[in-house]
Structures are given as C-alpha cells and as structure tokens.
C-alpha cells in the first residue's frame, strides 16, 4: 500500500492505494472505495479489503474532509459532500485528481472504473452517478439512498440491511425501487441474498439484502467483486 498526497485547489488530499498483485487482460480495473462519515481510507481498507478480493484491480481508499451532515451539523468528522454542484465541490475535484493520477500511473480506463462506498460514502456514489456518470462503468453503494440524484441508466450493485437504523431500510428500499422503475429493470432471479435485474438494453442491477444493521455487510464483497468483473 502507498499513500498519495494530491493538491486539489489549495487543499492537500490523501488516498491509500493498493496496486494490482495479479495481472488482468487489458487495462487494470480501478475501484474508488469511499468510507462512511467519521471513517477514513485506512479503516475501510481493513474492513472490506477489496484489494484482496479483487487482486487484479487498482483499489483506492481516499480520505474525506470534515463535512457537515444531518448527524454532524458542526462538520467535526470526515466524510463526503454531495450537496454542491461539481464546480464548487472539493470532493468531486478530488475524484478527478485521483482518476487522472490512476490513468497516468496504471493506464486505467473509465470503462473499467468503479465506485463503491458505505453510508455517507454510498451517498457520494449516487452523487457521482448523477454528476460524473461517464467516469465510471458501475456503482456499488451500501447503506445509502440516492435515487433523487437521477443519473443515467448505469449498472448498480446495491447493498442494504433490513435492521439498519441509521439509514432505515424502508428508505433504502424506496430508493432502489424507484431506480428499478426508472431504469426499466425486470427481475431475473435470485442467488442467495442477491436479487438480479436487467433492462431491455442489457444493463444490470443486483441488490444484496441481509438482516444486519448499519455496519457494512462484509459477506456482500464476493458478489460485488463478481459484479464488477462481469462488467469488464
């Protein structure tokens, strides 16, 4: 693992980067993994270990800045902002900087680039869907809701837990049901905890639901990685 320090405007931003340990055909896949509010890149790397589950990928775990949320109105803890338009949002600019550096170092491509995130980081994934859809091949938000962002039809792997009391499951369910309708998805079947959908154009969505709480569902990682690989 190495740590990048990037100048984004007048702010130094950090991200923790795992290089591929396994060769892939073509450009290496790239995953940006966004922690929840109050977290950091190192902790989410230890928690979900996407770099171990998908060793052929470049996996970047960025650090957020102190950010106001409903649960942290003073903005004392780090997270991600998606309430501002891209031109004034430091986090969107940080994403651009990471994507540019990854392209320069690893020859990554948007068609093989993915964003995942948990809680506040999952909400940020939905914001990227709305404001930077062409930079990503697919998204994997966890414990979040975001259909209000209304981005274009894109592949999604959504993780939700029925006993989540921070982002209540009924609100997450309303969000992904809205996305299913908007993107004209039809159910294709289930595999374990994953329900699969596809639209007439072949764009797919998978929804992983378990009985957990707001904590990240680590058992969702194999399905998430399989979904990413299926898009390459």
Residue ranges and their predicted role:
Residues 1-30, 42-43, 48, 57-58, ...:
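A domain-start/cap signature at the N-terminus of enzymes
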Residues 63-90:
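Cap/lid segment of the alpha/beta-hydrolase catalytic domain
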Residues 38-40, 67:
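Serine-hydrolase catalytic-loop signature spanning alpha/beta hydrolases and amidase-signature enzymes
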Residues 33-36, 61, 116, 158:
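Structural cue for short, hydrophobic secondary-structure segments
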Residues 93-111:
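Conserved acidic catalytic loop of the alpha/beta-hydrolase fold
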